[in-house]
Amino acid sequence: SRSICVGLFTYKHVKSPTQMERDAVCRGQYHGWLKEKVGSHIIRRNNIHHCEQGGIIGRMGGVFSIIEDNHIHHINNMMELGGAEIAGIKLHAAIDVIIRRNHIHHCTMGIWTDWEAQGTRITGNLLHDNQKPAFAKQLPGGMMSQDIFVEVSHGPTLIDNNVLLSDVSLRMATQGVAMVHNLICGSFTSVGAGVDSIVEGKLRQRY
């Protein structure tokens, strides 16, 4: 895939992020939130590159999925698009999702799990050179330049047996993460504030 926006996209509704979460929960309750009906995608052995927003993006409909053996690189390097979907892999509600054996490099961010990374496992991935381009200005509170970012969840999230070689290996604004048997060459950043969502000047509480 080579896309000016997103390589693979698993949802279709465009509203404010908080309202999309509410709508998705209501649709799930109405239609039956069952593993047999929701998610369970397999995304395997793709070469996804030079996308200007994200490589693989999922929201609610990506639950119970397996993302494995993909080569994802050169994502958002021109920084022509911004927003909350900027990463090689960006998932909202990565419930019981396995992200394994992917090679992710030269992205503004490597893997970003956002909202409800419950039962998520990130294992056996190789991540390196995931940072903002040299010409880009780092804005206060800017969420870029790391291999893995786990945000607003209570877990459990397991991150194991990965090779993390970027300047920042892990950024956390969450709870319930276990980091086990990783090779880590970069720094850790723990964020305790600044993750509230403001849409059209109004505070949309995440919790």
What are the language-model segments listed below?
Residues 1-207:
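Extracellular parallel beta-helix/beta-solenoid repeat domains
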